[in-house]
Swiss-Prot record:
It comes from Albidiferax ferrireducens (strain ATCC BAA-621 / DSM 15236 / T118). Keywords: ATP-binding, Chaperone, Cytoplasm, Isomerase, Nucleotide-binding. It is an enzyme of class 5 (isomerase). This is Chaperonin GroEL 2. The lineage of its organism: Bacteria, Pseudomonadati, Pseudomonadota, Betaproteobacteria, Burkholderiales. Together with its co-chaperonin GroES, plays an essential role in assisting protein folding. The GroEL-GroES system forms a nano-cage that allows encapsulation of the non-native substrate proteins and provides a physical environment optimized to promote and accelerate protein folding. It is found in: Cytoplasm.
Length: 544
């Protein structure tokens, strides 16, 4: 076992503070409509220009092991917020940084870290409740466009494009993003659907950047039951390999041996493939698999219709222009099904709806019909260079996540104002001890920081603008850093998804509480460097 280095108490907290501070300073510059970009060195190719807090955070690794612990813990805030909300990573980092610095000052004054933590938890619960009161539903297409534009670094064209996509496929519809071939981003709606099932093994991932499996011109095997053996499928698999097509397997269950065989073929490059579970449960699962069969022009392997695995031919497989599979969803784009058959299937589903006896059944049938009718909105991102394309694609993805969050939990005034207004819930709140009350005050002070950071990045004086905004009784009154004007932020289109704001706050408080309760850091001791000019036996340089 390698020897370890240990540091305690004030020394440990000082190292944590330095690491947290270093990462936060790099991430904070990207916040707001006038936030700066960051250039990241890459091992291969040209440097990457980004305006995304989570990408900046992920790229940072500090030389000092103890300082790096602080940086990595703060990075966890950005990563967790990105995973849960898809946006708000920089806000979460700014909040966590402020809470940690404020908390370390209290600890230096001799306060109890556990009481501080309890105070932070009390404050967060009160602020989250206040945010719910401040939020309102995201009702119009214009508001969706505003949310998307703000998330895309104030790019109105991205906002309009996403609003148009949601108009065409519905708020629950599937939206996919891919590289375009021109200078301008375009929207296209194609036959396809999305369902809530992801890959059965991460070894199927072939797009590391998006953590997804992407299969182009894909053949689709649909099984109503359990896929328990690939022996019967070997002749079919050999034909698929000869054609050079990837294979997507959708089945009720895939046993371990079959899954292992598919994974091994993928790793070896013999057959590009992916396996997912069929959507739904019971009879609804059978119906949804049949929906996919109609959409893709395939047949379902089922004992009921007399089609077994040993009898499956290439012509029985469904087809799609592309399949995108993530940990949670599968999106089929450009299904090869006949338009007439798809329309007939939709008509059948609507007749079933008329006969349905419960609201739940009617809702599920409506959902199935909408997925077949709506298709998939395909946003083809255009740019002049590859570097610009990657940066723009990241912004479109951020904007898509933000719009989903806005539809889910509503919207609040943006620009850091919602957190400032929610701070009013803490004005009269106290804990059972002085240290708990200090934890509440710590959160209250930190809620100012996103607004201060946005204003600072815009080149203005944070304290002056903070006081002006805080004095107004209007909850929507704030400062628009893009135009450098005051007014009703909701009317100006400066809005944030309530879910993103809430998760940023909760994740920041979670990591800050953990760090403030830390009393010891343990890291592997660096290996001593060999003395310069050292030689092996007999004065000769050793051979390796």
């Amino acid at each position: 076992m390698n020897p370890k280095q240990l540091i305690f108490h004030d020394d440990a907290r000082d190292k944590i503070r330095r690491g947290v501070d270093t990462l936060a300073q790099a991430v904070k510059v990207t916040l707001g409509p006038r936030g700066r970009t960051v250039i990241l060195e890459r091992d291969f190719g040209s440097p990457q220009i980004v305006n995304s807090g989570v990408l900046v955070a992920k790229s940072i690794e500090l030389e000092d092991r103890f300082e790096n612990m602080g940086a990595q813990l703060l990075r966890e805030v950005a990563a967790r917020t990105s995973e849960m909300a898809g946006d708000g990573t920089t806000t979460a980092t700014v909040l966590a940084h402020s809470m940690i610095l404020e908390g370390l000052r209290y600890l230096a004054g001799g306060m109890n870290p556990m009481d501080l933590k309890r105070g932070i938890e009390i404050a967060i619960d009160a602020v989250v409740a206040e945010l719910k009161q401040l939020s309102r539903p995201c009702a119009s297409s214009q508001e969706i466009a505003h949310v998307a534009a703000i998330s895309a670094n104030n790019d109105r064209s991205i906002g309009d494009l996403l609003a148009s996509a949601i108009d065409k496929v519905g708020r629950e519809g599937a939206i996919s993003i891919e590289d375009g071939s021109g200078l301008v981003s375009v929207l296209d709606v194609v036959e396809g659907l999305q369902f809530d099932r992801g890959f059965l093994s991460p070894y199927f991932i072939n797009n590391a950047e998006r953590q997804s499996a992407v299969l182009e011109d894909v053949a689709i095997l649909l099984c109503e039951g359990r896929l328990s053996s690939l022996k019967d499928l070997l002749p079919l698999l050999e034909e698929i390999v000869k054609e050079g097509r990837p294979l997507l397997v959708i089945a009720e269950e895939v046993d371990n041996d079959s899954l292992a065989a598919l994974v091994i073929n993928t790793i070896r490059g013999t057959l590009k493939t992916c396996a997912v579970k069929a959507p739904g449960f019971g009879d609804r699962r059978k119906a949804m698999v049949q929906d996919i069969a109609v959409l893709t022009g395939g047949s379902v392997v089922s004992d009921e219709v007399g089609l077994t695995l040993g009898k499956v031919k290439l012509s029985d497989l469904g087809r799609a222009t592309r399949a995108e599979i993530t940990k949670e969803t599968t999106t089929l784009i450009g299904g090869a099904g006949q338009p007439k058959a798809i329309k007939e299937r939709i008509a059948t589903i609507r007749k079933e709806r008329e006969l349905a006896s419960s609201d739940y059944d009617r809702d599920k049938l409506d959902e199935r019909a909408a997925k077949l009718a709506g298709g998939v909105a395909l946003i083809k991102v255009g740019a002049a260079t590859e570097t610009e394309l990657k940066e723009r694609k990241i912004r479109v993805e951020d904007a898509l996540h933000a719009t989903r969050a806005a539809v889910e939990e509503g919207i609040v005034p943006g620009g850091g104002v919602a957190l400032l207004r929610a701070r009013r819930a803490l004005l009269t709140l106290t804990g059972s001890t002085l240290d708990e009350t200090s934890g509440i005050r710590l959160v209250a002070r930190s809620l100012e920081e996103p607004l201060r950071c946005i204003v600072s990045n815009a080149g203005d004086e944070p304290s002056v603008i903070l006081n002006r905004v805080d004095e107004s009784p209007d909850p929507a009154f704030g400062y628009n850093a893009a135009t450098r004007t005051y007014g009703d932020l909701l009317q100006m289109g400066v809005i944030d998804p309530a879910k993103v704001t809430r998760l940023a706050l909760q994740n920041a408080a979670s990591i800050a509480s953990l760090i403030l309760g830390t009393a010891c850091l343990i890291a592997t001791a660096p290996k001593p460097l060999p003395e310069e000019g050292a030689h092996g036996p007999g004065g000769e340089t050793p051979m390796f």
